[in-house]
Amino acid sequence: MKTITELRQEIVDRSLQAFHEGLFSGTSGNMSCYLREEDLMLITPTSVRYDVMRAEDIVALRLDGTVVEGHLKPSSEWRMHAAVYEGCPDVNAVFHTHSPTAFAVNHQTIPAVLIEALVFLGGDIRCADYATPGTKEVGLNALPALEGRKGCTLANHGVLAVGGDLAQAYLNAEYIEDVARIYAIAHSVGTPVELKSL
């Protein structure tokens, strides 16, 4: 089991990777993990660029918002993360991106056009109903879209990927972006065929 120090560094490393891969831009997006036995969430701070973020900048807080350790404010989306941890007992990491292709401005489900969608994500990528950013409702609205899935899009907002740990959540965010990109390209030249089963 990783220490809190190691998890903080992993959040920084994966956030920087997401920044370089285009899943984050500026200070948008956020990542967290949850240590259930300690009731402790580690989350990226708000308004800090990922290319200058350090492990000590990661904020430790309870799901009720009580900051346990940290000199910066937690991500403005901490309530969304908390709602997902409360509603999904198998989830220990949440990754919220503003990726370029997996957008949700059209409020549509992204069909499972790649095998990865079935194998790793659980099927098509549903779109959660809109809620005001920074509110718990963003996370609550995501729960139905996450049922049986490892990620969803958030209407007019971005992507939410989850996993048992940070590595899984990050990988699922990459798969969501890949499926969305291939679907968008395929849709521009014809009608993509959705996979219903392996």
Cite the ranges covered by each PLM segment:
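Glycine-rich flexible loops
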Residues: 1-198
